[in-house]
């Protein structure tokens, strides 16, 4: 504990030494740095420094240092783990956007009679984190309930600096599960949350303002669903929403402003025949509206839906022939991570595309990926942490 405190205080002191008196005046002049505006105690964050400066120093810590910093002392832990601190960092542009990917883990290999190593099991999936600024890769610790891999086809969303993993199939029995897990990047820990009210697979998902929305998909009998629910991350509560006008299996969720778009999908009696329309939930009113011809009929929307410069939905698989198959895109601030293959069975490539419109008008820049992070990407989302 003492070593951790010494390390961080030494770095903070070095940083402060470079600041001029004018910086102190600047901090005092900013109303959002006033300790009186906080509901948690900010005094004595760093002995000998005003609360505002102590807060400024901790605000400048990179998110990767938060797990260790939260163990320095109780006041730091209280601050770093609070939603108030997250919103403060976001307000002054100190948050950081990363891609969280459900990705196949490296397979375990054994020697065969032909002396050619071969895999001993079907692929397991973990959560990979890609930092677009440093171009670095990392992998989250597994969920305690699933130490050998995440539920297959689980869906990801991010709210207020946390990652939410919902549903999927048990990796051993292949039975659909209702599990919900929340990962806190500050503590580097998973927490079991309240289960999804009912089993559903291949549903649309999106998040906004601390809530995660799910709609459509199919139940354990393979019947398509038109029901929708919203999960409040802070309250750990599920609330049922008004149903969509029709069933939508294998639909795709997209957040556009204050609207949750459920794109395409198909009905129970039309297995695999993807429809052209979309249904849009207006978050303010809680009402659904239909958007006819919003998507190309017969085209699977899973994980490849983007928004073009003209506001219309586009398929990221059409950006370049290199990503036409198994396409997955994650918007990351000023760019988009795009993953895909040139043809069925070929290895996936990882690219950054310019702009937030999925690279519609920009070229793809191929990313160098370490072997352990080159596995198949099933889905993903952006987390602002």
Would you name each region that the model predicts?
Residues 2-385:
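Kelch-like beta-propeller repeat domains
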């Amino acid at each position: 504990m003492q070593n951790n405190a010494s390390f961080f205080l030494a770095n903070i002191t070095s940083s402060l030494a470079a600041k001029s008196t004018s910086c102190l005046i600047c901090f005092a002049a900013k109303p959002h740095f006033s300790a009186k505006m906080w509901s948690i105690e900010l005094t004595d964050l760093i002995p000998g420094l005003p609360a505002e400066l102590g807060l400024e120093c901790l605000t400048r810590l990179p998110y990767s240092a938060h797990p260790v910093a939260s163990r320095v002392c109780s006041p730091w832990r209280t601050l770093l783990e609070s939603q108030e601190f997250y919103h403060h960092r976001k307000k002054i542009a100190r948050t950081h956007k990363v891609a969280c990917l459900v990705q196949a883990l490296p397979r375990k290999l054994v020697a065969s009679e032909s002396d050619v190593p071969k895999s001993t099991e079907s692929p397991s999936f973990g959560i990979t984190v890609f930092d677009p600024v440093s171009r670095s890769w990392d992998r989250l610790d597994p969920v305690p309930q699933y130490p050998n891999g995440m539920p297959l086809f689980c869906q990801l969303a991010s709210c207020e600096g946390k990652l939410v993993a919902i549903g999927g199939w048990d990796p051993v029995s292949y039975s659909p599960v209702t599990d919900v897990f929340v990962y806190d990047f500050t503590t580097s820990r998973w927490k079991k949350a309240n289960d999804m009210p009912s089993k559903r697979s291949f549903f649309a998902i999106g998040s906004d303002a601390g809530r995660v929305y799910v709609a459509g998909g199919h139940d354990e009998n393979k019947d398509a669903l038109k029901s929708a629910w919203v999960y409040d991350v802070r309250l750990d509560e599920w609330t049922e929403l008004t149903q969509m006008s029709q069933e939508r299996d294998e639909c795709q969720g997209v957040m556009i402003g204050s609207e949750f778009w459920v794109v395409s999908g198909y009905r129970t009696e039309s297995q695999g025949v993807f429809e052209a329309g979309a249904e849009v939930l207006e978050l303010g009113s809680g009402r659904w509206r239909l958007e006819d011809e919003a998507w190309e009929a017969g085209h699977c929307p899973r994980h490849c839906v983007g928004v073009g410069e003209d506001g219309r939905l586009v398929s990221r698989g059409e950006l370049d022939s290199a990503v036409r198959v198994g396409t997955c895109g994650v918007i990351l601030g000023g760019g988009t991570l795009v993953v895909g293959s040139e043809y069925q069975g070929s290895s996936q490539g990882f690219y950054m595309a310019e702009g937030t419109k999925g690279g519609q008008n920009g070229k793809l820049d191929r990313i160098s990926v370490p072997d352990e992070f080159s596995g198949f990407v099933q889905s993903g989302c952006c987390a602002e942490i």
